[in-house]
Amino acid sequence: MVKKGYSKIISNIYIVLIFLFLYLPIIVLVINSFNKSKFGGVWNGFTLDWYMQLFKDKSIILSLYNTIIVATLASVIATSIGTLASIGINSMTSRYKSVMLNLSYISMINPDIVIGVSLLSFFSLFQFLKLGYVTLILAHITLCVPYVVFAVLPKLQQLNPNLSEAAQDLGATPTQTFFKIILPEIKPGIISGMIMSFTLSLDDFIISFFTTGAGISTLSIKVYSMTKRGVSPKINALTTLMLLVIIILMIIIQIRSSKSEKNRY
């Protein structure tokens, strides 16, 4: 009993240390975003000045605008493509389905730098295609589609195939069957995939760095360029806001997943 007690204490300490290692830098960053001092090691009082300066910086506002536009377009298009791909994969035989899923896995586990360089090489084949908004959005779509597939496909696999057959037996067209039977059932997966795509696009730096053009900057690229001149308190404020947005999106995904699980039972 004593050994079990010590073992539990040690395991709890280990877990606490792991979480401190993961989240302590983030906590320090958030605290420093409200610090009057320009130097993180000294606390000189609470302030919102860095946030006020952040929103007065036109270059940051422009980067925010670019990021939101790219993330919105990429997530919507990737969700549409990923949903259709999921339906196609789900209708395949097990052999071909396994091949397609493995191909999707490869694109997910590939290092971002490999994807970024390969996309840059691919875009360079087309002389009419200049690096800019189009290439950036295409790159983000490529990044996000596999995640949508793996968000939607489980919902399709849970779907009772007899429902579609019954609807068509009762006179429903394939289009009506999709919109009235299939779509409502897989909607939680579609929404989760879209939110995940938006988050991935919002957070991406490496792929954006390789596929964006001159004069176009996303928030992640802007943060990188700002750090070259030293760690400004505005960077702390900007990354804190980005972190807040990502946390909110992940909470929404978790709530929707929990509701979906409750509805199943």
Please provide the spans of the model-predicted regions.
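Short membrane-interfacial helix/loop motifs at transmembrane-helix boundaries
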Residues: 24-58, 209-214, 265
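Transmembrane-helix boundary motif in ABC transporter permease subunits
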Residues: 1-8, 72-104, 117, 121-124, ...
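Membrane-cytosol interface at the C-terminal ends of specific transmembrane alpha-helices
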Residues: 133-169, 176-182, 192-197, 205
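Interhelical loop and adjacent transmembrane-helix boundary motif
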Residues: 3-8, 50-59, 202-259
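C-terminal transmembrane helix and the adjacent membrane-cytosol boundary/short C-terminal tail
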Residues: 2-14, 24, 153-168, 174-183, ...
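Hydrophobic alpha-helical transmembrane segments of multipass integral membrane proteins
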Residues: 61, 65, 69-81, 85, ...
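Membrane-interfacial helix termini and adjacent extracytoplasmic/periplasmic loops
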Residues: 39-41, 48, 113-143, 175, ...
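Short hydrophobic faces within alpha-helices
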Residues: 64, 89, 106, 162-170, ...
